[in-house]
Amino acid sequence: MGLPRGSFFWLLLLLTAACSGLLFALYFSAVQRYPGPAAGARDTTSFEAFFQSKASNSWTGKGQACRHLLHLAIQRHPHFRGLFNLSIPVLLWGDLFTPALWDRLSQHKAPYGWRGLSHQVIASTLSLLNGSESAKLFAPPRDTPPKCIRCAVVGNGGILNGSRQGPNIDAHDYVFRLNGAVIKGFERDVGTKTSFYGFTVNTMKNSLVSYWNLGFTSVPQGQDLQYIFIPSDIRDYVMLRSAILGVPVPEGLDKGDRPHAYFGPEASASKFKLLHPDFISYLTERFLKSKLINTHFGDLYMPSTGALMLLTALHTCDQVSAYGFITSNYWKFSDHYFERKMKPLIFYANHDLSLEAALWRDLHKAGILQLYQR
Protein backbone atom coordinates (compact mmCIF):
# COMPACT_ATOMS: atom_id res chain seq x y z
CA MET A 1 0.00 0.00 0.00
CA GLY A 2 1.47 3.39 -1.02
CA LEU A 3 1.65 6.60 0.93
CA PRO A 4 -1.64 8.52 1.28
CA ARG A 5 -2.12 11.13 -1.40
CA GLY A 6 -4.11 14.27 -2.09
CA SER A 7 -6.76 15.58 0.25
CA PHE A 8 -6.80 12.37 2.28
CA PHE A 9 -3.15 12.88 3.17
CA TRP A 10 -3.72 16.43 4.39
CA LEU A 11 -6.79 15.37 6.37
CA LEU A 12 -4.73 12.62 8.01
CA LEU A 13 -1.93 15.09 8.80
CA LEU A 14 -4.35 17.57 10.36
CA LEU A 15 -6.00 14.88 12.48
CA THR A 16 -2.60 13.64 13.66
CA ALA A 17 -1.47 17.15 14.60
CA ALA A 18 -4.74 17.86 16.40
CA CYS A 19 -4.55 14.65 18.43
CA SER A 20 -0.91 15.31 19.27
CA GLY A 21 -1.72 18.85 20.37
CA LEU A 22 -4.65 17.69 22.52
CA LEU A 23 -2.61 15.02 24.26
CA PHE A 24 0.27 17.41 24.87
CA ALA A 25 -2.05 20.11 26.21
CA LEU A 26 -3.55 17.64 28.68
CA TYR A 27 -0.08 16.60 29.80
CA PHE A 28 1.21 20.15 29.88
CA SER A 29 -1.64 21.40 32.06
CA ALA A 30 -0.90 18.80 34.72
CA VAL A 31 1.20 19.70 37.73
CA GLN A 32 4.77 18.73 36.86
CA ARG A 33 7.23 18.07 39.62
CA TYR A 34 10.89 17.24 39.49
CA PRO A 35 12.95 14.83 41.55
CA GLY A 36 14.46 16.44 44.61
CA PRO A 37 18.12 16.33 45.58
CA ALA A 38 19.50 12.98 46.61
CA ALA A 39 19.89 12.16 50.27
CA GLY A 40 23.09 13.57 51.66
CA ALA A 41 23.41 16.23 48.97
CA ARG A 42 25.08 19.46 50.03
CA ASP A 43 22.80 22.26 51.18
CA THR A 44 23.47 25.13 48.79
CA THR A 45 20.38 27.16 49.50
CA SER A 46 22.03 29.80 51.68
CA PHE A 47 22.45 33.34 50.38
CA GLU A 48 26.24 33.09 50.72
CA ALA A 49 26.34 29.81 48.80
CA PHE A 50 24.61 31.39 45.82
CA PHE A 51 27.09 34.25 45.59
CA GLN A 52 30.10 31.96 46.09
CA SER A 53 28.82 29.58 43.43
CA LYS A 54 28.32 32.37 40.92
CA ALA A 55 31.94 33.34 41.39
CA SER A 56 33.09 29.78 40.73
CA ASN A 57 31.50 29.59 37.29
CA SER A 58 32.02 33.14 36.02
CA TRP A 59 34.62 35.85 36.43
CA THR A 60 32.90 37.65 39.29
CA GLY A 61 29.99 37.23 41.67
CA LYS A 62 28.22 40.48 40.86
CA GLY A 63 24.68 41.31 39.96
CA GLN A 64 24.09 44.26 42.29
CA ALA A 65 22.58 46.37 39.49
CA CYS A 66 20.13 43.70 38.32
CA ARG A 67 16.49 44.55 38.74
CA HIS A 68 15.80 40.86 39.18
CA LEU A 69 18.39 38.29 40.20
CA LEU A 70 17.47 34.74 39.27
CA HIS A 71 19.34 33.28 42.22
CA LEU A 72 17.17 35.31 44.61
CA ALA A 73 14.08 33.97 42.85
CA ILE A 74 15.49 30.47 43.35
CA GLN A 75 16.12 31.19 47.01
CA ARG A 76 12.51 32.28 47.51
CA HIS A 77 10.95 29.30 45.72
CA PRO A 78 10.03 26.39 48.05
CA HIS A 79 10.69 23.72 45.41
CA PHE A 80 13.43 25.00 43.12
CA ARG A 81 15.70 26.09 45.97
CA GLY A 82 16.06 22.41 46.81
CA LEU A 83 17.01 21.51 43.24
CA PHE A 84 19.53 24.16 42.23
CA ASN A 85 23.13 23.65 43.31
CA LEU A 86 24.96 26.63 41.89
CA SER A 87 28.29 25.52 43.35
CA ILE A 88 28.64 22.47 41.09
CA PRO A 89 31.33 22.97 38.41
CA VAL A 90 29.72 23.67 35.06
CA LEU A 91 32.87 23.18 32.98
CA LEU A 92 35.54 20.50 32.88
CA TRP A 93 39.17 21.51 32.43
CA GLY A 94 42.65 20.14 32.95
CA ASP A 95 43.12 20.90 36.64
CA LEU A 96 40.02 18.85 37.52
CA PHE A 97 41.31 15.70 35.83
CA THR A 98 42.59 13.35 38.54
CA PRO A 99 42.87 9.57 38.92
CA ALA A 100 39.93 9.71 41.32
CA LEU A 101 37.78 11.54 38.77
CA TRP A 102 38.73 9.04 36.08
CA ASP A 103 37.88 6.09 38.32
CA ARG A 104 34.49 7.55 39.18
CA LEU A 105 33.41 8.78 35.75
CA SER A 106 34.63 5.64 34.01
CA GLN A 107 31.71 3.90 35.71
CA HIS A 108 29.17 5.95 33.74
CA LYS A 109 28.51 6.15 30.02
CA ALA A 110 28.72 9.40 28.08
CA PRO A 111 27.50 12.09 28.40
CA TYR A 112 27.50 11.36 32.14
CA GLY A 113 30.96 9.85 32.23
CA TRP A 114 33.70 8.00 30.37
CA ARG A 115 32.77 4.33 30.46
CA GLY A 116 34.34 2.59 27.48
CA LEU A 117 36.19 5.72 26.35
CA SER A 118 39.93 5.99 25.83
CA HIS A 119 41.89 7.29 28.83
CA GLN A 120 44.54 8.60 26.46
CA VAL A 121 42.02 10.63 24.46
CA ILE A 122 40.36 12.09 27.55
CA ALA A 123 43.67 12.90 29.25
CA SER A 124 45.29 14.43 26.17
CA THR A 125 42.23 16.58 25.47
CA LEU A 126 41.92 17.91 29.00
CA SER A 127 45.65 18.64 29.17
CA LEU A 128 45.06 21.25 26.47
CA LEU A 129 42.35 22.97 28.52
CA ASN A 130 44.97 24.11 31.01
CA GLY A 131 44.31 27.83 31.38
CA SER A 132 42.06 29.55 33.89
CA GLU A 133 39.82 30.71 31.04
CA SER A 134 38.83 27.06 30.52
CA ALA A 135 37.35 26.95 34.02
CA LYS A 136 34.99 29.90 33.63
CA LEU A 137 32.27 30.58 31.11
CA PHE A 138 32.77 34.34 31.19
CA ALA A 139 36.33 35.61 30.85
CA PRO A 140 37.29 38.92 32.50
CA PRO A 141 36.18 41.68 30.11
CA ARG A 142 38.66 44.06 28.53
CA ASP A 143 36.62 47.11 29.48
CA THR A 144 34.28 47.97 32.34
CA PRO A 145 32.37 44.83 33.34
CA PRO A 146 28.57 44.91 33.36
CA LYS A 147 27.04 44.99 36.82
CA CYS A 148 24.52 42.39 35.73
CA ILE A 149 25.13 39.48 33.36
CA ARG A 150 22.04 39.29 31.16
CA CYS A 151 21.90 36.25 28.90
CA ALA A 152 19.62 35.25 26.05
CA VAL A 153 19.46 31.60 25.01
CA VAL A 154 18.08 31.25 21.50
CA GLY A 155 16.53 27.95 20.52
CA ASN A 156 15.44 27.23 16.98
CA GLY A 157 11.69 26.87 17.51
CA GLY A 158 9.19 28.12 14.95
CA ILE A 159 7.69 30.52 17.49
CA LEU A 160 10.47 32.95 16.52
CA ASN A 161 9.35 33.25 12.91
CA GLY A 162 7.74 36.68 12.66
CA SER A 163 8.45 37.44 16.31
CA ARG A 164 10.59 40.56 15.71
CA GLN A 165 12.61 39.67 18.81
CA GLY A 166 16.01 40.29 17.19
CA PRO A 167 16.69 43.65 18.88
CA ASN A 168 15.62 42.30 22.27
CA ILE A 169 17.91 39.29 21.88
CA ASP A 170 20.90 41.40 20.82
CA ALA A 171 20.37 43.74 23.80
CA HIS A 172 21.58 41.02 26.18
CA ASP A 173 25.21 40.90 27.32
CA TYR A 174 25.65 37.34 26.06
CA VAL A 175 23.70 35.34 23.49
CA PHE A 176 23.76 31.54 23.37
CA ARG A 177 22.84 29.74 20.14
CA LEU A 178 22.85 26.07 19.23
CA ASN A 179 22.77 23.49 16.45
CA GLY A 180 21.21 24.86 13.22
CA ALA A 181 21.34 28.52 14.21
CA VAL A 182 20.35 30.21 10.94
CA ILE A 183 20.77 33.99 11.15
CA LYS A 184 20.93 35.37 7.60
CA GLY A 185 17.48 36.42 6.50
CA PHE A 186 16.05 36.16 10.02
CA GLU A 187 17.94 38.98 11.74
CA ARG A 188 14.73 40.81 12.66
CA ASP A 189 13.42 37.73 14.48
CA VAL A 190 16.54 36.17 16.02
CA GLY A 191 19.16 38.93 16.06
CA THR A 192 22.76 38.76 14.92
CA LYS A 193 24.79 38.54 18.12
CA THR A 194 26.37 35.23 19.12
CA SER A 195 28.56 34.84 22.19
CA PHE A 196 28.38 31.06 22.65
CA TYR A 197 27.52 28.24 20.27
CA GLY A 198 26.56 24.97 21.97
CA PHE A 199 26.54 21.56 20.31
CA THR A 200 27.64 17.98 20.16
CA VAL A 201 29.68 17.04 17.12
CA ASN A 202 26.77 14.87 16.07
CA THR A 203 24.17 17.66 16.28
CA MET A 204 26.50 20.16 14.64
CA LYS A 205 27.22 17.96 11.64
CA ASN A 206 23.63 16.76 11.35
CA SER A 207 22.49 20.39 11.33
CA LEU A 208 24.92 21.24 8.54
CA VAL A 209 23.54 18.39 6.46
CA SER A 210 19.85 18.74 7.28
CA TYR A 211 19.56 22.53 7.18
CA TRP A 212 22.13 23.45 4.55
CA ASN A 213 19.44 24.24 1.98
CA LEU A 214 17.59 26.31 4.60
CA GLY A 215 20.55 28.59 5.27
CA PHE A 216 22.72 26.84 7.85
CA THR A 217 25.83 26.62 5.69
CA SER A 218 28.44 27.12 8.40
CA VAL A 219 28.87 27.11 12.16
CA PRO A 220 28.83 30.63 13.65
CA GLN A 221 32.30 32.16 13.78
CA GLY A 222 33.72 35.35 15.26
CA GLN A 223 36.66 36.77 17.17
CA ASP A 224 34.86 36.85 20.51
CA LEU A 225 32.60 33.85 19.92
CA GLN A 226 33.24 30.76 22.03
CA TYR A 227 32.19 27.14 21.54
CA ILE A 228 30.61 24.93 24.20
CA PHE A 229 31.22 21.23 23.57
CA ILE A 230 28.68 18.79 25.03
CA PRO A 231 30.65 15.54 25.55
CA SER A 232 28.10 13.03 24.29
CA ASP A 233 30.66 10.64 22.81
CA ILE A 234 34.38 10.09 22.29
CA ARG A 235 34.16 12.01 19.01
CA ASP A 236 33.50 15.25 20.94
CA TYR A 237 36.78 14.88 22.83
CA VAL A 238 38.67 13.95 19.65
CA MET A 239 37.24 16.91 17.71
CA LEU A 240 37.98 19.30 20.58
CA ARG A 241 41.58 18.13 20.85
CA SER A 242 42.09 18.43 17.09
CA ALA A 243 40.53 21.90 17.04
CA ILE A 244 42.89 23.20 19.72
CA LEU A 245 45.93 21.62 18.04
CA GLY A 246 44.82 22.83 14.62
CA VAL A 247 45.18 19.42 12.99
CA PRO A 248 42.81 17.13 11.07
CA VAL A 249 40.81 14.67 13.15
CA PRO A 250 43.03 11.57 13.31
CA GLU A 251 40.49 8.86 14.09
CA GLY A 252 36.89 7.84 14.48
CA LEU A 253 33.72 8.87 12.66
CA ASP A 254 35.11 12.31 11.85
CA LYS A 255 38.53 11.17 10.65
CA GLY A 256 39.98 13.64 8.18
CA ASP A 257 37.73 16.53 9.20
CA ARG A 258 39.53 19.86 9.47
CA PRO A 259 38.22 21.64 12.56
CA HIS A 260 39.15 25.09 11.26
CA ALA A 261 36.42 24.62 8.64
CA TYR A 262 33.93 24.65 11.51
CA PHE A 263 35.52 26.97 14.06
CA GLY A 264 37.77 29.26 12.04
CA PRO A 265 41.55 29.35 11.51
CA GLU A 266 42.45 30.93 14.86
CA ALA A 267 40.88 28.54 17.33
CA SER A 268 43.05 28.39 20.44
CA ALA A 269 42.07 26.66 23.68
CA SER A 270 40.52 29.89 24.96
CA LYS A 271 37.82 29.57 22.28
CA PHE A 272 36.47 26.32 23.69
CA LYS A 273 34.52 25.24 26.75
CA LEU A 274 33.61 21.69 27.75
CA LEU A 275 30.57 20.85 29.86
CA HIS A 276 31.44 18.70 32.87
CA PRO A 277 29.86 15.21 32.80
CA ASP A 278 28.98 15.70 36.47
CA PHE A 279 27.05 18.84 35.54
CA ILE A 280 25.08 16.96 32.89
CA SER A 281 24.36 14.18 35.39
CA TYR A 282 23.16 16.70 37.95
CA LEU A 283 20.87 18.42 35.43
CA THR A 284 19.40 15.11 34.34
CA GLU A 285 18.90 13.78 37.86
CA ARG A 286 17.35 16.89 39.34
CA PHE A 287 15.55 18.61 36.48
CA LEU A 288 15.09 16.25 33.54
CA LYS A 289 14.86 12.71 34.93
CA SER A 290 12.56 11.40 32.23
CA LYS A 291 10.48 8.25 32.45
CA LEU A 292 12.16 7.33 29.16
CA ILE A 293 15.24 6.37 31.17
CA ASN A 294 13.44 3.26 32.43
CA THR A 295 12.30 2.13 28.98
CA HIS A 296 14.11 0.45 26.11
CA PHE A 297 14.92 4.00 24.92
CA GLY A 298 16.92 4.62 28.08
CA ASP A 299 20.32 4.33 26.41
CA LEU A 300 19.27 6.91 23.81
CA TYR A 301 17.90 9.50 26.20
CA MET A 302 19.70 12.67 27.21
CA PRO A 303 18.53 16.27 27.67
CA SER A 304 18.33 18.20 24.42
CA THR A 305 21.09 20.58 23.33
CA GLY A 306 18.75 23.49 23.96
CA ALA A 307 17.95 22.28 27.47
CA LEU A 308 21.63 21.91 28.34
CA MET A 309 22.44 25.40 27.05
CA LEU A 310 19.51 27.00 28.85
CA LEU A 311 20.34 25.30 32.14
CA THR A 312 24.00 26.25 31.69
CA ALA A 313 22.95 29.89 31.42
CA LEU A 314 20.72 29.55 34.48
CA HIS A 315 23.77 28.41 36.48
CA THR A 316 26.11 31.18 35.30
CA CYS A 317 24.11 34.33 34.45
CA ASP A 318 22.26 36.83 36.64
CA GLN A 319 19.24 37.09 34.32
CA VAL A 320 18.20 34.64 31.62
CA SER A 321 15.70 34.98 28.79
CA ALA A 322 14.76 32.00 26.61
CA TYR A 323 13.65 32.44 23.00
CA GLY A 324 12.57 29.75 20.56
CA PHE A 325 11.87 27.10 23.19
CA ILE A 326 8.84 24.83 23.32
CA THR A 327 5.68 26.34 24.82
CA SER A 328 2.18 25.00 25.51
CA ASN A 329 0.91 26.16 22.10
CA TYR A 330 3.84 24.66 20.18
CA TRP A 331 1.47 23.14 17.62
CA LYS A 332 0.72 26.59 16.19
CA PHE A 333 4.28 26.94 14.95
CA SER A 334 6.63 25.08 12.66
CA ASP A 335 9.38 22.91 14.13
CA HIS A 336 12.05 25.52 13.26
CA TYR A 337 11.81 29.24 12.55
CA PHE A 338 13.80 28.98 9.32
CA GLU A 339 11.57 26.43 7.57
CA ARG A 340 9.82 27.64 4.42
CA LYS A 341 6.81 25.39 4.92
CA MET A 342 4.94 24.40 8.07
CA LYS A 343 6.55 21.32 9.60
CA PRO A 344 5.00 19.92 12.80
CA LEU A 345 7.24 19.30 15.78
CA ILE A 346 8.00 15.59 16.19
CA PHE A 347 8.68 14.09 19.61
CA TYR A 348 11.58 11.65 19.30
CA ALA A 349 12.60 9.16 21.97
CA ASN A 350 16.10 10.56 22.56
CA HIS A 351 14.70 13.68 24.28
CA ASP A 352 11.69 14.35 26.51
CA LEU A 353 10.42 17.64 25.11
CA SER A 354 7.22 17.40 27.14
CA LEU A 355 9.22 17.31 30.36
CA GLU A 356 11.43 20.15 29.17
CA ALA A 357 8.39 22.25 28.25
CA ALA A 358 6.91 21.76 31.72
CA LEU A 359 10.22 22.78 33.29
CA TRP A 360 10.46 26.01 31.26
CA ARG A 361 6.84 26.80 32.14
CA ASP A 362 7.46 26.34 35.86
CA LEU A 363 10.75 28.26 35.87
CA HIS A 364 8.98 31.12 34.10
CA LYS A 365 6.14 31.10 36.63
CA ALA A 366 8.69 31.13 39.45
CA GLY A 367 10.38 34.23 38.02
CA ILE A 368 13.66 32.37 37.55
CA LEU A 369 13.49 32.46 33.76
CA GLN A 370 11.85 34.76 31.23
CA LEU A 371 10.32 32.52 28.56
CA TYR A 372 9.28 34.13 25.28
CA GLN A 373 5.69 33.15 24.49
CA ARG A 374 3.00 34.34 22.10
Swiss-Prot record:
It is a single-pass type II membrane protein. One of its GO terms (biological process) is viral protein processing. Disulfide bonds join C66-C148, C151-C317. Glycans are attached at N85, N130, N161. Its main location: Golgi. Residues 1-7 are cytoplasmic. It catalyses: a beta-D-galactosyl-(1->3)-N-acetyl-alpha-D-galactosaminyl derivative + CMP-N-acetyl-beta-neuraminate = a beta-D-galactosyl-(1->3)-[N-acetyl-alpha-neuraminyl-(2->6)]-N-acetyl-alpha-D-galactosaminyl derivative + CMP + H(+); a 3-O-[N-acetyl-alpha-D-galactosaminyl]-L-threonyl-[protein] + CMP-N-acetyl-beta-neuraminate = a 3-O-[N-acetyl-alpha-neuraminosyl-(2->6)-N-acetyl-alpha-D-galactosaminyl]-L-threonyl-[protein] + CMP + H(+); a 3-O-[N-acetyl-alpha-neuraminyl-(2->3)-beta-D-galactosyl-(1->3)-N-acetyl-alpha-D-galactosaminyl]-L-threonyl-[protein] + CMP-N-acetyl-beta-neuraminate = a 3-O-{alpha-Neu5Ac-(2->3)-beta-D-Gal-(1->3)-[alpha-Neu5Ac-(2->6)]-alpha-D-GalNAc}-L-threonyl-[protein] + CMP + H(+). GO terms for cellular component: Golgi membrane. It is found in: Golgi apparatus membrane. Residues 29-374 are lumenal. Its EC number is 2.4.3.3. Expressed in skeletal muscle, heart, kidney, placenta, lung and leukocytes. Pathway: Protein modification; protein glycosylation. It comes from the Eukaryota. CMP-N-acetyl-beta-neuraminate binds at N156, N179, S304, H336. CDD domains: GT29_ST6GALNAC2. The chain crosses the membrane at residues 8-28. It is an enzyme of class 2 (transferase). Keywords: Disulfide bond, Glycoprotein, Glycosyltransferase, Golgi apparatus, Membrane, Signal-anchor, Transferase, Transmembrane, Transmembrane helix. One of its GO terms (molecular function) is alpha-N-acetylgalactosaminide alpha-2,6-sialyltransferase activity. Catalyzes the transfer of N-acetylneuraminyl groups onto glycan chains in glycoproteins. Conjugates sialic acid with an alpha-2-6 linkage to N-acetylgalactosamine (GalNAc) glycan chains linked to serine or threonine in glycoproteins. Sialylates alphaGalNAc- and Galbeta1->3GalNAc-O-Ser/Thr epitopes also known as Tn and T antigens. Belongs to the glycosyltransferase 29 family. Aberrant O-galactosylation of IgA1 molecules plays a role in the development and progression of IgA nephropathy (IgAN). Genetic interactions of C1GALT1 and ST6GALNAC2 variants influence IgA1 O-glycosylation, disease predisposition, and disease severity, and may contribute to the polygenic nature of IgAN. This is Alpha-N-acetylgalactosaminide alpha-2,6-sialyltransferase 2. The lineage of its organism: Eukaryota, Metazoa, Chordata, Craniata, Vertebrata. The gene is ST6GALNAC2.
